[in-house]
Curated annotation (Swiss-Prot):
Protein name: Neuropathy target esterase sws
Topology in membrane: Single-pass type I membrane protein
Motif window: GXGXXG: 931-936
Lumenal compartment segments: 1-34
Biased composition, class Basic and acidic residues, residue ranges: 1382-1396, 1445-1458
Amino acids binding a nucleoside 3',5'-cyclic phosphate 1: 174-301
Location relative to the cell: Endoplasmic reticulum membrane
A Gene Ontology molecular function term of the record: protein kinase A catalytic subunit binding
Length: 1483
């Protein structure tokens, strides 16, 4: 509220104001003259009450004395009674009756009549006169300090492991997971090197063939420039290693090199462990799967660490690769006659094409016109001969030009953009040698392509027949795209025979929309004839990192990914040649960076660096989550921020060369890339564009930190996180078994789909994808790599935990950025044992409580404080209103079928699930309502306009009158109810006679605030802020601590009242927590328990109402407008990404009169009363005091207007006064009309999308959804070396949670299955939990009934070649039934299937046989067609045995007698399902 306008209230009463100037002057004068009379009357009243009480007490004493004298007289006249005695029963009866009479007297005081009634009446009157307050403290939130592990790192000793073995184990972890026997073999080859200060560990011309691990001391790695100068690259300390993974590939492929520019020298006495790279060859010969896995890990590190750090953060693109690939083996082919001269001629005739040095300069697309033909075809031929000097050379390009010279222009114009020829030289239409525009023998082309790819893959001439069936040739025209960036389906190994290919990559600074435009792509390099491309995506198993287009008319030979993996099965060492091809393309810069960049694995609780340590490096978070904690001199720890995937940690301290200011530790298992300071300086000197990139990056960071500055939340031991939260992984944990976790996860998944790609994972999903033994320690690498890839592909991954502490639940806790604890709001708040175990597993992970309420309930959330007090580890809570289908008890079958249809619809962005989804992804929308007295009625109109514009509201903050209106919206969420309550409150504020009764002696304020408190308390009741549907905060001015206070919990009405306590009119509110005095928060920030208390505190106008005393600490609270009248910055700090701020405060007049150096009051009086002089504008004393009080508020308001995260709106309500509460409807209509027009204009301008659109996604279509099998983690060792892979058996699938239904888009883990399988019912039971059946979250996976003809039983089925090669035929249920199997008579029931499953688990031998047969079945799909029949024959006998085990016992079927309509309907559904099953069986 505004003090100035309140003092200048209109005297004519046209706006129904409460005060007028004349009345105020009269009252002030009467108080000044009659002050002594009031004092005298008060003294007389007090004396009268004391006299009355004294004489009444005296009368009671006299009556007691008379009774005593009468009793003594009776006793003295009775004679001697010493011989009389009472029986025990009479004594017990006497004392019992006496006790009952006492109890009756005590209990009678509770009623309105009886003894003590008059005394209570007098006390009530005295309490009303003297304003005595009864002690009635509401329930408070317990402020419990977080556990030490939450803010401290884990320090554990490693005494059990020798130091050398420990450092060895940590260092070779970059090569992947090694079993213990393999690790011991590698340790046998280690050597200990003793170095003194100044000794060289290695220098230039030394062989680069070892891994060095520093056991003690310090090693300096530096670069030697051509001019003899040196530049430090990095400092290697205890436990760190010096190696190049690229050199590792060179050594294994037989191309070992020497150190050319890198040297290492000991800075002090050091002990270094040396591990020769040749030691791995012995291990790889015995374990080829280990070799393949190591090469894959190296390629993944190259893509995720080197390219991520250098491209995304330093702006390097084309600088990472060479424009011309180095030849394989050597640059001059020794077997070719005159090879050196030929190479020189090739280099002389080849056009020099310089790749751009950075994404901005660098080379425009006009300089690289893709439609230009190759200027020198002979140069391409020479280059081809240079690479394959000893190969039978065929000048295909030149021969093609000669043969096609006679082709007319019209014929050339009708050419297709590309033509593909298969292994036999035939085009797809089946005609051989019919390529348009050429007469070259395609068989010769095919033979040359096979021979070229054979050499690139390192195969001998005898192995040509292995790759010949898979080599395809394709002719391309200019601008034809072979593969796009991010595509995982068309990954191939491309070999250029003629022409040139151009490789592009999207700009690192491009947004999601601009990345779709190819004009923003950056040219990386060209691929010339004789060069190969595509090996990186082939080895990593991930999507392509580049876009490849034809620059001119070209001919390429390629092998698809599936074919390469089949070739790897027979020749695993081709992975070395593919890796060597990738390494040969890299620039020397990447090799130097490979020595300096480190790939760090951190477990939960481990520190990256500690406070006050030297800052010599920065870190990039590849996966996981980090927490920054500062330790104050007093020992108190405070969270500074948290960092997620893609964030840069420690960059400012490294550049400024200051010590670490905080300690950064891992919240969960994390991967980081370490960028040393020396490497950064070396790149900076060589590529100055990096400095520009870094300045831009730091400028955005500092600008964001300036905009997000704010105060910390009140009352919390850990301050609010200033970093915008954005979670990548979310774990969902049920509190009790009756929590519908699966429907809840589906609903959340549905809402998240509107924001971006999301994935839901369960234990059964992972087992289906990776095998039933995937959670064992030996499969740690596969599991973590697969999960990391899923997290990279999706903006958020949902981990649905089991209801027990299973290995999958423990994995979820290790992977989660945040844990959502899901409970039922109407149930007991007690903490279960399982929930406590979850807290122990993830002590550092942030946990949030989600309380579910049925949509049919009319009650509002209550008792939330009890839930939070019982769980001190919870940092935030959410109230979620759920639709009816969530709480309906259904089988897993029907849940899946239900949500397969629900997920096809558009989610409701206004639902609580969508609000939770936006919070998890960092897209919350905040609404900030400013203060302004009666002008706050415009907030109601703006709320209606916001609702009609389709903008959801996820968080609400308010000051003064905005605190009142915002609290109403958070409590009701219905614009009609909010309008009605706001109108009733405004009408109460116009009743002047009630305000007159509230007048008091004006020492602190003019009014006592009692009636004002009553109006707010009647509006909200005893509601706490924690019980509101929407997260809410209010801001007050704490005059005890001289700062503003943010209230997110506690009494609602009290803090709303304190936020409206305008100075001079109401006393400050005394905070019950600490006793601080709180005023209107608008004094410091005019845009931002029991609910009404904080609303009352936020409306404590100084001078009008007394400050409100906080019931927690006793601080006095005043109106928040004195500090921040529009707290949009506070809302941003609390996590809102997009904010709408509505300002209804008054605007000061800035057009003041310049009166010179001095000012006379008499001159102002003359100007005021003389009608013939021009008026002057000079502020008076109240105006000056008001402007002084709002100095910080005005400054903060200007920052909010200039911020990029806030949409500042000010309705045209300046003509209305602060106390014009009688014009509520008129002001509301003004706000509504203005808001509607404002948002309509935003929609037309395209600026409304950031509030109601986040991700443009087409509505999902049935049967056209993504699948994990289409793009998933590829374990080359598993594929190539045929490692034992365990899959879920047929009977194990019974306990599978998720099945694949047609159109079921929420679980993209398997392919579409036969629809007839869905129609198979359970034997003897329906699909509802209302009947007696197994309580499980899984559905039946039953085999289809098939009848096998006797004539075909003895003949093995012939495999289909196309089916075998199809990538979608990997399911075992799509294979033909083995010949000796028998058809099933009927489907087994749940009980029998359960018994069969347990019997199989007890029989270890049978289980191993089943697993091996399942592996053979799967290998039939991916192996060469020639081995298909043999694998099928091997599988047949065991399948017959398995079917015999699955065959149920013959029992008569018992049908229940229907008693109700519901049971009759279920009976009909069951009968219909059985009829369909019989029909399918006959077919």
């Amino acid at each position: 509220m505004d003090v100035l306008e309140l003092l200048r209230a209109s005297a004519n009463g046209c706006y129904n104001t409460l005060f007028s100037d004349a009345w105020f002057q009269y009252v002030s004068k009467q108080i000044a003259t009659t002050m002594y009379w009031y004092g005298a009357l008060l003294v007389i009243g007090v004396l009268f009450i004391a006299w009355f009480l004294y004489f009444k007490r005296l009368a009671r004493l006299r009556l007691r004395d008379e009774i005593a004298r009468s009793l003594s007289a009776v006793t003295s006249s009775g004679g001697d009674h010493r011989g009389l005695r009472f029986r025990k029963r009479d004594k017990m009866l006497f004392y019992g009756r006496r006790m009952l009479r006492k109890m009756k007297n005590v209990s009678g005081q509770m009623y309105s009549s009886g003894k003590g009634y008059k005394r209570r009446a007098v006390m009530r009157f005295a309490r009303r006169i003297l304003q005595l307050q009864r002690e009635n403290r509401p329930l408070e939130m317990k402020t419990v300090e977080p556990p030490a592990e939450y803010l401290e790192e884990t320090i554990e000793g490693s005494d059990r492991v020798p130091p050398d073995a420990l450092y060895m184990l940590q260092s070779i972890r970059i090569f992947g997971h090694f079993e213990k026997p393999i690790f011991l073999k590698l340790c046998k080859h280690t050597q200990l090197l003793q170095l003194m200060a100044g000794d060289y560990l290695f220098k230039i011309t030394d062989p680069d063939d070892s891994v060095y691990i520093v056991q003690s001391g310090m090693i300096n790695v530096y670069i030697c420039n051509a001019d003899g100068s040196t530049l430090s690259l990095k400092t290697v300390r205890k436990g760190e290693s010096v190696t190049s993974l690229l050199s590792f590939i060179d050594v294994l492929s037989g191309n070992s090199s020497y150190y050319k520019t890198v040297t290492a020298k000991a800075m002090e006495k050091s002990v270094v462990i040396r591990l020769p790279m040749q030691a791995f060859e012995e291990v790889f010969e015995e374990n080829p799967d280990v070799m393949i896995r190591v090469i894959q890990v190296i390629m993944i590190r190259l893509q995720r660490v080197l390219f991520t750090a250098l491209r995304n953060y330093l702006g390097l693109n084309a600088e990472l690769v060479q424009n011309h690939m180095r030849t394989k083996g050597s640059s001059v082919v020794p077997n070719a006659v005159g090879g050196a001269v030929l190479a020189q001629a090739s280099q002389a005739s080849r056009p020099v094409v310089r790749a751009p040095t950075s994404p901005n300069s660098r080379l425009s697309r006009e300089e690289h016109t893709l439609s230009d033909p190759d200027p020198n075809p002979n140069a391409n031929a020479l280059l081809f001969a240079e690479v394959h000097g000893d190969a039978p050379y065929i000048d295909l390009y030149h021969h093609q030009q000669q043969q096609s010279s006679a082709v007319s222009v019209n014929q050339a114009g009708t050419r297709r953009s590309s033509t593909t020829y298969g292994p036999s030289g035939e085009s797809p239409n089946g005609n051989a040698n019919t390529a348009p525009g050429t007469s070259i023998d395609q068989r010769l082309v095919q033979s040359s392509a096979v021979d070229s790819l054979r050499r690139e893959l390192g195969l001998s001439e005898d192995d040509a027949q292995i790759i010949e069936p898979f080599v395809e040739v394709r002719e391309l025209e200019p601008n034809v795209t072979l593969i796009t960036e991010g595509n995982a389906e068309d990954v191939c190994v491309w070999f250029v025979m003629t022409g040139t290919l151009a490789v592009y990559q999207s700009n690192a600074d491009a947004t999601r929309a601009t990345k779709q435009d190819s004009k923003n792509d950056v040219l990386i390099h060209f691929v010339h004839p004789g060069e190969i491309v595509g090996g990186l995506a082939m080895l990593t198993g991930e999507a392509s990192a580049y876009t490849i287009r034809a620059r001119s008319n070209s001919r390429v030979a390629y092998i698809r990914r599936a074919a390469i993996y089949q070739i790897m099965r027979q020749r695993p060492r081709i992975v070395l040649d593919l890796g060597n091809g990738v390494v040969r393309r890299l620039s020397p810069l990447v090799r130097q960076c490979d020595y300096a960049l480190d790939w760090i694995f951190l477990e939960s609780g481990r520190a990256v660096y500690r406070q006050d340590e030297s800052s010599d490096s920065t870190y990039i978070v590849l996966s996981g989550r980090m927490r920054s904690v500062i330790t104050h001199p007093g020992g108190k720890k405070e969270i500074i921020g948290e960092y997620g995937k893609g964030d840069l940690v420690g960059i400012v301290e490294m550049i400024t060369e200051t010590s670490r200011t905080t300690t950064v530790m891992a919240v969960r298992d994390s991967e980081l890339a370490k960028l040393p300071e020396g490497l950064f300086n070396a790149i900076k000197l060589r590529y100055p564009i990096v400095v520009t990139r870094l300045i831009s990056f730091l400028s955005h960071r500092f600008l964001g930190s300036m905009q997000t500055r704010g105060s910390n939340a009140a009352g919390g031991p850990v301050e609010a996180n200033p970093v915008t939260h954005k979670y990548s992984t979310v774990a969902l944990v049920p509190i009790t078994d009756d929590v519908p976790l699966t429907p809840f996860t589906y609903e959340l998944y549905h809402s998240l789909c509107a924001i971006g790609p999301v994935l839901r994972l369960t234990s059964e999903v992972v087992r289906k994808q990776l095998g039933i033994n995937i959670f064992e320690a030996a499969n740690e690498y596969r599991l973590t790599s697969w999960l990391a890839q899923q997290e990279d592909r999706n903006i958020i991954t949902l981990y649905q935990c089991d209801s027990s502490l299973s290995p999958w639940t423990q994995r979820c806790m290790r992977q989660a950025d945040v844990v959502l604890i899901v409970g039922l709001g109407e149930r007991s708040h007690l903490v279960g044992k399982f929930e406590r175990e979850i807290d122990k597993l993830a002590m550092r992970t942030q946990k949030e409580l989600v309380l579910l309420y049925p949509e049919t309930t009319n009650a509002k959330p209550a008792n939330t404080l009890s839930w939070l007090n019982a769980r001190p580890w919870v940092t935030k809570h959410h109230h979620v209103l759920c639709v009816k289908r969530i709480f309906t008890r259904k089988s897993q079958y029907r849940i899946n079928d239900l949500y397969s249809r629900v997920l096809l619809s558009e989610p409701n962005m206004h639902s609580d699930f969508s609000r939770l989804a936006r919070w998890l992804t960092g897209n919350s929308i905040g609404l900030v309502l400013g203060g302004g007295g009666a002008r706050g009625a415009a907030h109601i109109g703006m709320l209606k306009a916001i609702q009609e514009a389709g903008i959801p509201i996820d968080m609400v903050g308010g000051v003064s009158i905005g605190a009142l209106m915002g609290a109403l919206w958070c409590s009701e969420r219905n614009i009609t109810t909010v309008t009605q309550k706001a109108r009733e409150w405004s009408k109460k504020m116009t009743k002047w006679f009630l305000q007159l009764l509230d007048l008091t002696y004006p020492i602190t304020s003019m009014f006592s605030g009692r009636e004002f408190n009553k109006t707010i308390h009647d509006t909200f009741g005893d509601v706490s802020i924690e019980d509101l549907w929407i997260p809410y905060f209010t801001l007050t001015t704490d005059i005890t601590a001289s700062c503003h206070r943010i209230h997110t919990n506690g009494s609602l009405w009290r803090y709303v009242r304190s936020s409206m306590s305008l100075s001079g009119y109401m006393p400050p509110l005394c905070d019950p927590q600490d006793g601080h005095l709180l005023l209107d928060g608008g004094y410091v920030n005019n845009l931002p328990g029991h609910l009404w208390r904080y609303c009352r505190a936020s409306m404590s106008i100084a001078g009008v109402f007394p400050p409100f005393c906080d019931y927690r600490d006793g601080h006095l609270l005043l109106d928040g407008c004195y500090t921040n009248n529009v707290p949009a910055d506070v809302m941003h700090n609390l996590g809102a990404a997009h904010i709408i701020a509505i300002d209804v405060g008054s605007q000061d007049d800035t057009d003041l009169t310049n009166y010179g150096d001095d000012l006379s009051g008499w001159w102002l009086l003359y100007k005021k009363w003389n009608p013939f002089t021009s008026p002057v504008k000079v502020p008076d004393l109240p105006d000056i005091q008001s402007r002084l009080a709002y100095v910080s508020c005005v400054r903060q308001l200007e920052e909010v207007k200039n911020s990029d995260y806030c949409e500042y709106i000010r309705p045209p309500i300046d003509k209305y006064k602060t106390l014009a509460f009688g014009s509520f409807d008129e002001i509301r209509d003004v706000g509504y009309v203005f808001g509607k027009n404002y948002f309509d204009n935003m929609a037309k301008a395209g600026r409304l999308g950031r509030f109601n659109q986040w991700f443009n996604k087409e509505p999902p279509k049935r049967g056209n959804h993504a699948s994990l099998n289409e793009y998933t983690f590829i374990d080359l060792a598993q594929i190539v070396c045929k490692l034992p892979e365990t899959y879920a058996l047929n009977t194990a699938d019974i306990f599978s949670e998720d099945e694949d239904f047609d159109g079921y888009i929420s679980e993209p883990t398997t392919l579409n299955m036969d629809r007839r399988r869905i129609q198979v019912p359970r034997a003897g039971n329906s699909l509802s939990f209302s009947e007696t059946e197994m309580d499980s979250d899984v559905e039946i996976d039953l085999e289809l009934e098939r009848k096998v003809d006797k004539a075909t039983q003895s003949t093995p089925p012939t495999p289909n070649k196309q089916h075998a090669l199809s990538p979608t035929s990997s399911q075992t249920n799509l294979l033909p039934l083995p010949p000796n199997s028998k058809p099933k008579e009927k489907q087994p029931s749940y009980d029998k299937l359960d018994r069969e499953h347990k019997r199989r688990q007890k029989s270890k031998q049978k289980q191993q046989q089943e697993r091996s047969s399942m592996q053979q079945r799967d290998s039939m799909v991916t192996l060469h067609p020639a081995t298909m029949a043999e694998a099928t024959t091997q599988t047949a006998p065991h399948s017959s045995e398995e079917d015999e085990l699955n065959k149920p016992e013959q029992q008569p079927e018992q049908k229940p007698v229907p008693e109700t309509e519901e049971q009759q309907q279920k009976q009909q559904d069951q009968q219909q399902q059985e009829n369909l099953t019989k029909t399918d069986t006959k077919n």
